[in-house]
């Protein structure tokens, strides 16, 4: 293995960067909600859903593929082959993203009118198509720098990109868009696209400065397609179903007599609740980003013991971390949503989804480990099953049960996906955690929430929950002396 910073310190570095970026992103979401309202946020979410589908289709699995194939070459001590891997990835990306961009431009009016329901955003769809190849090529370069363990460089560029993007976007919103929701959508897409241009040029310049001597040309196409196509199918299916859901939800909610403003209710959950729910995930996204190439390198080098060790530690960390924020978000939900959005109803929805935090956070890590071990085809199967169920549940439940039906569908499908993913991981690594560990963790979370909820002051609730949860986890021996020694060792290690 290369003698570079351990994965723990790289994860800390990415965590710091991701936290800063998430603070900025959440603040921007608050700014937008105050400027264009819940209905405007709902329209923006629909536009971004279509854009997200196009981006996923244009990426066609290339970001993870570039990361995986680069890590594989480095794990086999063949750095001279990386140039040919990148060359193949770039050509693949240009073909896929170019094709999707053309389709977006040709069908922009139909997408805006029939899918989104607002013909005025057709220009926004075309604007997104213009920047699509840039975003996809940026994904290739980010995958390379992550696999090459150049985390510091990547973090610096990402911070600079975010500063550039936010500055441009806020300027466009303030001086041009005003409170016009369609112009606000265009401003967000324009700012993001120009930020992607900055990132791509920066990473290409830094790669060129490496002056690595390439080896003899190697065949890449078959390996690339074997990796990228299953990923593309899984990602496209997941994104496609997600887009269908987002476009369908307001229309099906309109049939429910309990929902006065379906677009506002949809915007409240997707544009207000989910950003808060997923804000603490910065550390796990950082870890997941590093686990894919790390597992690929270990698998290529035959380091099965290290794979098992990392899988056990990562899954345990995600479970405990999710448990911590499960209770905090549940107990502080009303205060957070009133402070951020001046919206008490969003607090009710945040309480519902906060209870799912341990499962959602663990699923992020599990998915990364499976991809790092080359199990892309399994991901396709799981996404087909759960996504199909999600659409069926939403179609049937929303007109009768409203947002309660939305939550039920979210719970069942995400739980099923998580169970299938964990089952696949355990087949590859063997037993990682005793079944008693998640059960005792859940018991500790429930008791800590119940006792802390008796307090009225929000700060007191939060502090009491942290202390109670930590004490109960130690009492139940979920956190052992071995864990404490491990943490101390990480802190002391140079």
Label the predicted regions.
Residues 6-67, 94, 101, 105, ...:
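Signature of the first transmembrane helix
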Residues 93, 97-240:
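Hydrophobic transmembrane helix module of multi-pass membrane transport proteins
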Residues 32-53, 181, 185-186, 222-227, ...:
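Interfacial/gating helices of multi-pass transporter permease domains
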Residues 109-128, 329-360:
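Interfacial segments at transmembrane-helix termini and the short loops linking adjacent helices
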Residues 1-24, 80, 84-87, 218-238, ...:
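N-terminal membrane topogenesis motif
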Residues 452-494:
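Membrane-proximal transmembrane or re-entrant/amphipathic helices at the cytosolic face
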Residues 60-75, 278-303, 311, 315:
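Helix-loop junctions and terminal segments of transmembrane helices
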């Amino acid at each position: 293995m290369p003698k570079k910073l351990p994965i723990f310190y790289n994860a800390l570095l990415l965590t710091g960067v991701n936290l800063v970026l998430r603070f900025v992103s959440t603040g921007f979401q608050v700014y937008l909600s105050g400027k264009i309202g819940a209905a405007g946020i709902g329209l923006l979410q629909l536009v971004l859903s279509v854009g997200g589908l196009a981006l996923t289709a244009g990426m066609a699995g290339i970001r993870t593929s570039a990361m995986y194939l680069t890590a594989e070459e480095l794990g086999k001590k063949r750095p001279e082959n990386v140039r040919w891997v990148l060359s193949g990835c770039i050509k693949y990306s240009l073909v896929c993203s170019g094709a999707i961009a053309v389709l977006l431009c040709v069908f922009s009016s139909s997408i805006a009118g029939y899918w989104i329901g607002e013909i005025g955003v057709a220009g926004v769809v075309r604007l997104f198509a213009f920047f699509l190849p840039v975003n996809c090529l940026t994904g290739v370069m980010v995958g390379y720098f992550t696999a090459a363990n150049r985390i510091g460089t990547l973090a610096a560029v990402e911070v600079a990109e975010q500063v550039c993007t936010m500055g441009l976007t806020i300027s466009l919103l303030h001086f041009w868009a005003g409170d016009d929701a369609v112009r606000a959508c265009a401003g967000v897409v324009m700012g993001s696209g120009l930020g992607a241009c900055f990132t791509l040029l920066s990473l290409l310049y830094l790669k060129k400065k490496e002056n690595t001597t390439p080896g003899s040309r190697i065949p890449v196409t078959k390996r690339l397609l074997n990796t990228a196509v299953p990923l593309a199918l899984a990602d496209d299916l997941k994104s496609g179903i997600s887009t269908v859901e987002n476009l369908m939800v307001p229309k099906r909610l309109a049939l429910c007599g309990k929902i006065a403003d379906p677009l506002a209710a949809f915007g409240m959950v997707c544009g207000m609740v989910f950003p808060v729910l997923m804000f603490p995930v910065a550390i796990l996204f950082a870890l997941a980003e590093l686990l894919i190439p790390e597992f690929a390198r270990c698998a290529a080098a035959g380091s099965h013991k290290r794979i098992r060790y990392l899988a056990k530690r990562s899954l345990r960390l995600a479970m405990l971390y999710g448990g911590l924020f499960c209770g905090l978000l549940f107990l502080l939900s009303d205060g957070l949503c009133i402070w951020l959005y001046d919206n008490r109803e969003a607090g009710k929805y945040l309480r519902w989804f906060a209870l799912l935090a341990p499962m959602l956070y663990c699923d992020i890590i599990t998915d990364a480990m499976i991809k790092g071990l080359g199990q892309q085809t399994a991901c396709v199967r799981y996404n087909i099953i759960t996504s199909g169920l999600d659409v069926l549940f939403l179609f049937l439940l929303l007109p009768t049960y409203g947002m309660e039906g939305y939550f039920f569908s979210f719970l069942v499908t995400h739980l099923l996906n998580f169970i299938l993913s964990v089952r696949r991981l355990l087949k590859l690594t063997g037993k990682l955690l005793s079944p008693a560990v998640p059960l005792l963790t859940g018991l500790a979370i429930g008791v800590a929430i119940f006792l802390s909820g008796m307090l009225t002051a929000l700060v007191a609730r939060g502090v009491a929950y942290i202390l109670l949860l930590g004490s109960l986890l130690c009492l139940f021996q979920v956190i052992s002396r071995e864990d404490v020694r491990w943490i101390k060792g990480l802190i002391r290690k140079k």
